[in-house]
Curated annotation (Swiss-Prot):
The keyword Membrane does not apply. It comes from Bacillus thuringiensis. Keywords: Sporulation, Toxin, Virulence. Toxic segment of the protein is located in the N-terminus. The keyword S-adenosyl-L-methionine does not apply. It comes from the Bacteria. This is Pesticidal crystal protein Cry2Ac. GO terms for molecular function: signaling receptor binding; toxin activity. Belongs to the delta endotoxin family. Pfam families: Endotoxin_C, Endotoxin_mid, Endotoxin_N. GO terms for biological process: sporulation resulting in formation of a cellular spore; symbiont-mediated killing of host cell. InterPro entries: Galactose-bd-like_sf, Pest_crys_dom-III, Pest_crys_dom_I, Pest_crys_N_sf, Pest_cryst_cen_dom_Cry2A/18, Pest_cryst_cen_dom_sf.
Length: 622
């Protein structure tokens, strides 16, 4: 038997990418460039049944929330989704979903849906034409007032949205429903923002503020419910679960999470929900009951800055003996994930083996972050003489490619996303582990057998100034007066870690920290810009609690109870509200600690869901 230890590192340099990394690259990118990148993604990474328009629309809406320009979002959205009046892109979304979930509309229902798409396009186009006429009275016939057009279109939306909620096809039509809801909520937001220019009364503006609150709530709850029902019914291999989740997050929940931020303006959304990709190695079947553990395993160290991974691998060749075929077998025995500051994860895989590979970015990972992975595995047979059991384990930064084993199969990449963590699973995970999700930053070795599949965690998070001495992120505030968000899971440190968990959310631009013990303190570190902001915390406190916030030596307190006083969205057990903590200053050119302490008044269920620094001159729309 001949054993080959793969101690080398395969690297490929892409010279065209050797540029200084821009922590606000997404904000500086044109919509035309974004559209081209999603089309190229579809052309080269075709394994996922996702129409590229869904990624473009998500990016477009994020840019609009982060901008003060372009109040007429509805007109731009029409040109994106219905170019030249065509419904082809919406039909492409439907066909992709039919392929993905293996369900088709019957002929009559398909006819109804296509008619509704055509009607939606015509209604939006007519409204935009009427607004153009109203704003250009010297060129076109002028309507006496735009309010009639506004109210008419709102009623048309309310009559058309139910046509994408047909009984028996809720999951299949969910991506189309989400796009139709994008139109309706963008329209409502536009009415509020354009009220002065359009001559809309204060009373009508109040009505449409109420509409924005109500329909964000109703549409969000509708999207969450069929997804959760479908996910709970899964009993699949890990790649199937992750693919289903990624598909629905790109097609639906990217939008749902943005809707909750439509009340803000000029707010840079600096991170979002994770997208996951895995290899296809043999593992046990998992159910939704196992998901809380898997979820915790994949992002238990999401607040650290990824630097690479190390472990043990072998490629073994069994020679032709007694007429048996030559057999090549590649095995990843164990892996540890490494972060800046000398921090490493627990071991995934076999124990008591010597490390024989170490992959790192070579350069500062803030300048050359990981962006792409190859994680597939399979078996090749060359007649009856040779059989090869191969694994792929390759990772690409913006500069170089590194391999545990050579890159093969489909790559995992999403435009404007970065690989912010790596994890993995063994062939069989113990029931004891599956029943006990990892707490925040927990170090727990998983498995006693070889790694069956690695998992890469993709996130939009990019505005990282530097790393704290413990290896965690320092969040960079924009240079201008744009507001920004910080994900609660990207903390510098949290005390009471053993009773702090990451909780999955669908309508929140990422996940929450769930505190199960009173008086935890979560610290975040910001690189300030000297600007003053209104600090909002999105929290779910089902029961009474007191929040104490400390920044720049000032202390702010707020008593909260969101049991009934909330936005109306039930997001995986959370009922949230955005709490205005007060006016804070992000001191310039220094690292600013932000401490958030929570005291329970009784026994509430408490989750910290988002941290938002909102420009003081742009209060929320409701």
């Amino acid at each position: 038997m001949n054993t080959v230890l793969n101690n080398g590192r395969n690297t490929t340099c892409h010279a065209h990418n050797v540029v200084a990394h821009d922590p606000f690259s997404f904000e500086h990118k044109s919509l035309n460039t974004i559209e081209k990148e999603w089309k190229e993604w579809k052309r080269t990474d075709h394994s996922l049944y996702v129409a590229p328009i869904v990624g473009t629309v998500g990016s477009f809406l994020l840019k609009k929330v982060g901008s003060l320009v372009g109040k007429r979002i509805l007109s731009e959205l029409q040109n994106l989704i219905f170019p030249s009046g065509s419904i082809d892109l919406m039909q492409e979304i439907l066909r992709a979903t039919e392929q993905f979930i293996n369900q088709r509309l019957n002929a009559d229902t398909l006819g109804r849906v296509n008619a509704e798409l055509a009607g939606l396009q015509a209604n939006v186009a007519e409204f935009n034409r009427q607004v153009d006429n109203f704003l250009n009275p010297n060129q076109n016939p002028v309507p006496l007032a735009i309010i009639d057009s506004v109210n008419t279109l709102q009623q048309l939306f309310l009559s058309r949205l139910p046509q994408f909620q047909i009984q028996g096809y809720q999951l299949l039509l969910l991506p189309l429903f989400a796009q139709a809801a994008n139109f309706n909520l963008s329209f409502i937001r536009g009415v509020i923002l354009n009220a002065d220019e359009w001559g809309i009364s204060a009373a009508t503006v109040r009505t449409y503020r109420d509409h924005l609150r109500k329909f964000h709530r109703d549409y969000s709850n509708y999207c969450i419910n069929p997804y959760q029902t479908a996910f709970r019914g899964l009993n699949h291999r890990l790649p199937d679960m992750l693919e289903f989740r990624t598909y629905m997050f790109l097609n639906v929940f990217e939008y749902v999470s943005i809707w909750s931020l439509f009340k803000y303006q000029s707010l840079l959304v600096s991170s979002g929900a994770n997208l996951y990709a895995s290899g296809s190695g043999p593992t046990q079947s998992f159910t939704a009951q196992n998901w809380p553990f898997l979820y915790s395993l994949f992002q238990v160290n999401s607040n650290y800055v990824l630097n690479g991974l190390s472990g043990a691998r072998t490629t073994i060749t069994f020679p032709n003996i007694g007429g048996l075929p030559v057999y090549h077998n590649s095995t990843l025995h164990f892996a540890r994930i490494n972060y800046r500051g000398g921090v490493s994860s627990s071991r995934i895989g076999q124990a008591n083996l010597n490390q024989n590979f170490n992959i790192s970015t070579l350069f500062n990972p803030l300048q050359t972050p990981f962006i792409r992975s190859w994680l597939d595995s399979g078996t090749d047979r060359e007649g009856v003489a040779t059989s090869t059991n191969w694994q792929s384990g390759a990772f690409e930064t913006t500069l170089l490619r590194f391999s545990i084993f050579s890159a093969r199969g489909n790559s995992n990449f999403f435009p404007d996303y970065f690989i912010r963590n790596i994890s993995g699973v063994v062939g069989t995970i113990s029931n004891a582990d599956l029943a006990r999700p990892l707490h925040f930053n927990e170090i727990r070795d998983i498995g006693t057998t070889a790694v069956a599949s690695l998992v890469t965690v993709h996130n939009r998070k990019n505005n990282i100034y530097d790393t704290h001495e413990n290896g965690t992120m320092i969040h960079l505030a924009p240079n201008d007066y744009t507001g920004f968000t910080v994900s609660p899971i990207h903390a510098t440190q949290v005390n009471n870690q053993i009773r702090t968990f990451i909780s999955e959310k669908y309508g929140n631009q990422g996940d929450s920290l769930r505190f199960e013990l009173s008086n935890p303190t979560a610290r975040y570190t910001l690189r300030g810009n000297g600007n003053s902001y209104n600090l909002y915390l999105r929290v779910s406190s089902i029961g009474s609690s007191t929040i104490r916030v400390t920044i720049n030596g000032r202390v702010y307190t707020a008593n909260v109870n969101t049991t009934t006083n909330n936005d109306g969205v039930l997001d995986n057990g959370a009922r949230f509200s955005d709490i205005n903590i007060g006016n804070v200053v992000a001191s310039a050119n220094t690292n600013v600690p932000l401490d958030i302490q929570v005291t329970f008044n009784g026994n509430p269920q408490f989750e910290l869901m988002n941290i938002m620094f909102v420009p003081t001159n742009l209060p929320p729309l409701y």
